[in-house]
Amino acid sequence: QSLEDMYKVLFNKISSMETRLYNLVSSGTEEDLTVLGPYFARNILETTCSILIGRIDPYRLIYVQKVQSLEFSINSKSKSAISWAGDVFGKDKNSKNKLWDSEKEYNSDGRAMLSLQYGEIYWNPAYKKLIDDTDYLTDASLENYRMRIESPENFIKYLRSECSSLYSSLSKGVHSELVMDSAIIYDKSTVIDLIYRTFKMCSTLGMVSHYIDLS
């Protein structure tokens, strides 16, 4: 299976979740929306991140596919699977001045998509290219990408903060960790806002990723 074929599978997953969300919002009951909305939205966020991991580090996606094609069981957790904590978010134990430390082993940092290291190498420069691209962006559309970011150097911090908050909020709607009535917290307006934030984040990640220099 080629990398292109894997992208098609992931794209079809996103397309399916988008259709389900659209049907929920437009014609579903409020109860179905509040129960299923967070699950569909988190699926879109996770799948988008998987695609972008493959864009930056194709080997990681190919590795997962190779392992799953040989042996895959729904009865046990796959140690090779892409995870939010390991592959997307990564660690944040270093100060800005200690990102590159000769005393640390290479494997201690990992290669998470939203790690501070990847932020400095890929995301921050790509975001700067985006907001400087006057041939593409108008002043009005540029405001959609400036958001709450004071400078391009802080873009990765914005991504980490927003993605962490969004993932946590969506997960609470998916897992049974609440001991109070979830409808009190996840009413229709809350779920609609989470869905909106999910699409905004996925769109932002996708747009900025096109400005990443992988040459």
Where are the regions that the model predicts?
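Short non-catalytic regulatory patches outside canonical folded cores
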Residues: 2, 46-160
